[in-house]
Amino acid sequence: KHGNLDYVLEQAGSIDLFIHLGDVEGDEEYLDAVIECEKHIVRGNNDFFSRLPREEEFDIGKYHVFITHGHYYYVSMDVDTIIEEARSRNADIVMFGHTHKPYFSQKDGLTVLNPGSLSYPRQDGRKPSYMVMEIDEEGKAHYEQKYL
C-alpha cells in the first residue's frame, strides 16, 4: 500500500509541501514519518476515527488554496458545488479527492484539481496518479499530472 508513495517521494527528491486529500485510512503516523516537509492532510469519507480536519485553507505563494476530500460537495456528480464553495472562500485553487479520478480545469481565475489516487485509482486504465505543482520565479503555478 505504501510502495507507490515511497516511489513517488524517492522520484521527487526534494519537496516543499505535501498535500493529501483524504482517505488516509489510519496512515497518519506513517505519513508523519516519511514526509519531512510541511504537510496538509484532510479527512476523507473512509477516515472514520480520524482527528484530521475536514478541510483546510492556506496560501501557496500568491494563491489562496482550499482543500477538502470533496464528498460533502457531491464531487461524484459534478464540480459545481465545490466551485461555488471555493469562490465563496475567495480561493484561487481548490483541490479534492473522493472520486479517485484525475481532474483538472482552470476557469475564471479558479483552478480545480483532483490528483487521482496512488493506492486505489478508479479512472479508465486505473493507473495510479498524483499531481505536482511548481511555482516559477515569477510566482506562477504550473501543474503536471503524473502516472505510475
Where do the language-model regions lie?
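N-terminal active-site segment of His-dependent metallophosphoesterases
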Residues: K1-E36, D47-F48, P53-R54, R126-S129, ...
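Helix-adjacent hinge/juxtasegments
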Residues: E38-E85, R89
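Beta-strand-turn-beta hairpins that frame and shape the catalytic cleft
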Residues: E57-F66, Q106-V112, M133-Y143
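Active-site environment of divalent metal-dependent phosphoester hydrolases
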Residues: K1-L5, E25-E29, N46-R51, Y73-M77, ...
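A short helix->loop->beta-strand "cap" motif at the edges of active sites that frequently abuts
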Residues: E36-E38, L110
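Binuclear metal-dependent phosphoesterase catalytic core
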Residues: G3-D6, E84-N90, L113-L148
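Active-site neighborhood of phospho(di)ester-bond hydrolases with catalytic His/Asp-centered motifs
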Residues: L17-D23, H40-N45, F66-H69, I93-H98, ...
